């Protein structure tokens, strides 16, 4: 059933979000229109501001309203000499939430995927190489996803970084804390056994 053109447009716009199907989009639209008009207006205002004012950090490519994000503006972070390479800004948030990393990041905004037209240029690897030649970087931690594309991307970046006398490491992959072995896939188990450490 079709509603008014504006309601249909709102539902279709909400469907553009990842994981939102037609029923979920319809429920969200009706909730905003029936009960949450103030929330809807605030959402529209926040979305408009974010779309017009949020860009990418000129150093690491994560989201920011400034030329440099707060992490890249921190002398404490710069002085560590460590850059962690991740695929998305969401990866930065996940690592920051853990509170165990105090260096800087470089966000690829994807991974190598020649079939999709994503090569080194699209990932900003020229900018990453400029960081490596600046003598400010002593270690590069590769934290790409444990997928075929993520591994290929990590190997490509490692080959590039070796030319600059930088220590290169890859984050460990394995069984999650609190996970039960019977539910872990065979590839993850293999990585866990291969990456085991002495006690």
From Swiss-Prot:
Q: Which GO MF terms are attached to this record?
A: DNA binding; zinc ion binding
Q: Which UniProt keywords apply?
A: DNA damage, DNA recombination, DNA repair, Metal-binding, Zinc, Zinc-finger
**Key word Metal-binding present:** yes
PROSITE patterns on file: TOPRIM
Q: Which SMART domains match?
A: TOPRIM (SM00493)
Q: Which Pfam families match?
A: RecR_C, RecR_HhH, RecR_ZnF, Toprim_4
Residues in C4-type zinc fingers run: 57-72
Q: Which GO terms describe its biological process?
A: DNA recombination; DNA repair
Toprim domain location is 81-176
Role, per record: May play a role in DNA repair. It seems to be involved in an RecBC-independent recombinational process of DNA repair. It may act with RecF and RecO.
* NCBIfam families for this protein: recR
Family under the similarity heading: Belongs to the RecR family.
Record-linked HAMAP family: RecR
Protein name, as recorded: Recombination protein RecR
